[in-house]
Amino acid sequence: MNSTEIMADLSSHTPMMQQYLKVKKDYQHALLFYRMGDFYELFFEDAHLAAKLLGITLTHRGKANGNPIPMAGVPYHSAEGYLARLVKAGRTVAICEQVGEVTGKGPVERKVVRILTPGTLTDDALLTSYQSSNLVALCIHQNQIGFALLDLSAGIFKVQQQDYKPEQLPIELARLMPSEILIDEDLVDPNIIEQIKKHLDCPVTKRPNVDFNLNNAQKTLCDQFSVSTLSGFGLDPLPLAKAAAAALIHYAKETQKTALPHIRSILLEQSTDFIALDPITRRNLEIIEPLFEHGTSLFQLVNDCQTAMGGRLLSRTLMQPVRDTALLDARLDAIEQLIQGYHESPVRLVLKEIGDIERVLSRVALGSARPRDLVQLRHACAQIPFLRNALAPVVQAKKSKLLGQLDQELGDFKSLHQHLMAAIVENPPVLLRDGNVIAEGYDAELDELRQIRDHAGQFLIDLEIKERERTGISTLKIGYNRVSGYYIELTRAQAEQAPADYIRRQTLKNAERYITPELKSFEDKVLSSESRALAREKALFEALLENLRENIAHLQMMSSAIAQIDVIANFAHQARLNNWARPEFTPETGIKIQGGRHPVVEALSKAPFTPNDTFLDVQHRMAIITGPNMGGKSTFMRQTALISLLAYCGSYVPARAAKLGPIDRIFTRIGSADDLSTGKSTFMVEMTETSQILHHATNQSLVLMDEVGRGTSTYDGLSLAWACVVDLTKRVKCLCLFATHYFELTELGSEPGIDNYHVTAQELNGNLILLHKVQQGPASQSHGLQVAKLAGIPANVIKEAQKRLRILEKQQQQHLQTSVQSDLFATLDSEVTPSIQVIEKVIEVEVSSPALDLLKQIEVDNLTPRQALEQLYELKAALNS
């Protein structure tokens, strides 16, 4: 039984359930949190789902069509934890609050006040400190695609439009790090959704076509920014980008139930502004998340930012390294100036005192800020003079234009700080409804209401004394009951002495009770003072928020400047702490790294890290790296990529020196496992990744390839690896580090553009010592058995392996003396099948073969024993063919 089935006949339900069903009708896509007193209740199918996802008790309330109505609930005061779990699970939640007064006639008025979705979160309780809530929209038309990103919690809004290439979609989306993706329900190819879900762990929400309407998009955005044209934003020739952006505005307003005053501008980006990193590369390099549960990512290592907004900016910076060397040098100049004068330490000490102002301002703009948010903002305003003072030596030296600019953007918020000091108590309660948020002395009316509320007894004592003196009646007394309210009581004998302003309220057997205008005024005030004081506080608090919204642009600029200063100071701190060097950029193709180190491995290793040099340029594009397992080949390749990545993020790098030419993309093919979800073998996964590289790498790409071809037979794998080296060197002309156990590939070291390197190792008394040093020339042997010995393989197994190795080496030597070398190891000038065709053929063969096709056709349940035997013979024949 669900709510949809019983909506046809509402008359059979209680008024409360009728109200619930009417609200639920408009929010079928969401879990409806329906406020009832101190609980949020869920009914029907929502109750079943919530009980399952949250582990809460499923009960019943009333009946529908003769059946008990399922119900589950969570306490109002602890709802945020439950909401966070539901949103993390990709669910949408509609919050339905009581907005009317309890009258005793029918259910209290309720309405949905906001909708929580994974891409529209702003509350700290629903987000981790370094987690962005990125809402992304796609608009595809013909051969073009528009992207738009909105982070409501940070006020970030940006777009781009480019040629639509399906294989590029995962790369762009990975850079944007979406929490939720909006698509047009009418226009999207189902394959797009499948591709998104394959590469990204985020929900895809289908939206009405009207939200993406190209004709309405211009007006939607102009209304949002209060402008008559979008020319100033550079969006005129980009209709799909505008449509995607407009869809985000519609969705955000619908979920927040309010305007978006903190979304004041929009940034136009180009994909060519950044170094492209596909999802595989991001994962293999462990940029944000480690490969294993207890591992350490690059972000986790280098993030010692003092503010949450600085940490989020650092995360975005690492995920989208920029190619503008002027911007990079500006960042590096700022880092250098902080390092030279030891200025990063005092800057970081001040930053540590600043809260998450970025999110506070978003909540202010959306009307969901709480009292302690304003305390955070007040404290941040107080820290600005100290931060500018810490930056002053660098700013005054005028050697970093970027820090000078950021110093100006910090602004001066002395008057705002004073206003907030006067308005908000030092330690307000968490929620405004608890009262006592507005400071004493800020508002005369509120002070009077509190005075009445808190000192009613004393007022009555004083009034009683005053009235006795005025009337001369010493037995006059003032009292109160719930029926009559406040009253002045006189005996019947004294009633004749009552002043003219005494108004008879009640007559008793032996007394008369009166009310005066003064007492009536007091009664009205005291009986409503609690609720009126709270209402007044709410009005004053909303006025404060409105005042802040009027200054939101300057406050957001201050917040952004703090985040940027934090990232720069963090990079300076890492450089000093870890002895990193400033990289140089050159327009000439190449990577030259002296004494490079892997930042994460070095930090976590107890032993001293062995630094290595990397040298690639137009004359030396390909480095074939051989040597034993555990020798450091993968570490060396990854450190080259991470050093390049950090440099293009504007950071110092873990090396003695580094000089880098242009890089448009970084590719990695390192390690694979079976993809059980798609039925792909390890080898198939490897070939698919390799195919992507061969199709999309350019002469400005950095490519890392590790053990290509190892998942198949020796000669198949060797042939594929050989063809890849040839193609990457001769056709693609990228910069490539190619690690392999196929020693035959070292024959290519004599060809133009290809060099051999090896990781060094020594045998001492039968034991292998790994030196982790990369040197020129091929490795002399693989040391595979010695590595197996180090891993604890039993001695008898090692001994048997040594015997077999000697036999195989002898056989291989005899075989190589015949025709293999002349056929397989042709020079680059020979006719070589392009490696892309080779890879695609392998993929085709794995996906479809005569034996596999025959096997698929067999109906196992219908075979007789004789037919089964015949089928086996056919399968064997197909395999042999």
From Swiss-Prot:
Database matches in InterPro entries: DNA_mismatch_repair_MutS (IPR005748), DNA_mismatch_repair_MutS-lik_N (IPR007695), DNA_mismatch_repair_MutS/MSH (IPR017261), DNA_mismatch_repair_MutS_C (IPR000432), DNA_mismatch_repair_MutS_clamp (IPR007861), DNA_mismatch_repair_MutS_core (IPR007696), DNA_mismatch_repair_MutS_N (IPR016151), DNA_mismatch_repair_MutS_sf (IPR036187)
Pfam families, sorted: MutS_I (PF01624), MutS_II (PF05188), MutS_III (PF05192), MutS_IV (PF05190), MutS_V (PF00488)
Gene (name only): mutS
One GO biological process term: mismatch repair
Family stated for the protein in its record: Belongs to the DNA mismatch repair MutS family.
Protein name: DNA mismatch repair protein MutS
Binding site for ATP: G627, P628, N629, M630, G631, G632, K633, S634
Keywords from the named record: ATP-binding, DNA damage, DNA repair, DNA-binding, Nucleotide-binding
GO molecular function, one term: ATP binding
Entry-linked SUPFAM superfamilies: DNA repair protein MutS, domain I, DNA repair protein MutS, domain II, DNA repair protein MutS, domain III, P-loop containing nucleoside triphosphate hydrolases
Purpose of the protein: This protein is involved in the repair of mismatches in DNA. It is possible that it carries out the mismatch recognition step. This protein has a weak ATPase activity.
Cellular component per GO, a single term: cytosol
